Amino acid sequence: MTSDFAAAAVVGRVQVAERADAARNRRKIVDAAGLILESRGAAGLSMDEVARVARVGVGTVYRRFGDLSGLAHALLADQEQRFQEALLSGPAPLGPGASPKERIAAMLSALVDRLEENSELLLVAETSAPYARFTCPAYEVHHAHLVALIAEASAVSGSAVDAEFLADALLAPLATNLYLHQRKVRGLSAERIRHGLAALLAPL
């Protein structure tokens, strides 16, 4: 029994050490990616370069984050957490206390703000892998939140709308590649895009 307990204790210490090592590597990788982003922009991000700066094997980077999209989402994680907290418990109109339609408009406007601040990194997060925009947890949270608010707004107004479809339709213009196309090629201002998004709420 004593030897069994001793062996279990050794295994436990090894597992804790491995978890601590994995956490350190993750932090090193994220810090390295942030340094590259700050000094060279999103165009300088690659899995190989991040591994070089972090001084870890490129296989470690892939194991931790899967692809460049996963790494970009990790860099955006703190901002995304603050945004979700604001949706759930922040001040109105983004948080509770305003009408459902006002909250939807505020959410879309806040997403425009994020695109203005982080379009380069968001573009990497959304386009570095097929369907990356739609398979990340953040999109699912945004979609589910909009579905709930649309259902509430529809109940208030008596309008019959497909909440799941409309939620995707409202998020579609906020895909980073389309947003940048409208801003840089079509010359639309951020404020004009906000007004356009607000107009999509007419069915509610």
Q: Where is each model-derived feature located?
A:
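Basic, helix-initiating cap at the start of DNA-binding domains
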Residues: M1-V53, G70-H73
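Amphipathic alpha-helical interaction segments
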Residues: K28, E49, G70, E102-A110, ...
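Amphipathic alpha-helical segments used for helix-helix packing
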Residues: A72, S109-R133
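Hydrophobic/aromatic-rich alpha-helical bundle segments in the mid-to-C-terminal region
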Residues: L122-T127, A132-C136, E140-H143, A151-L200
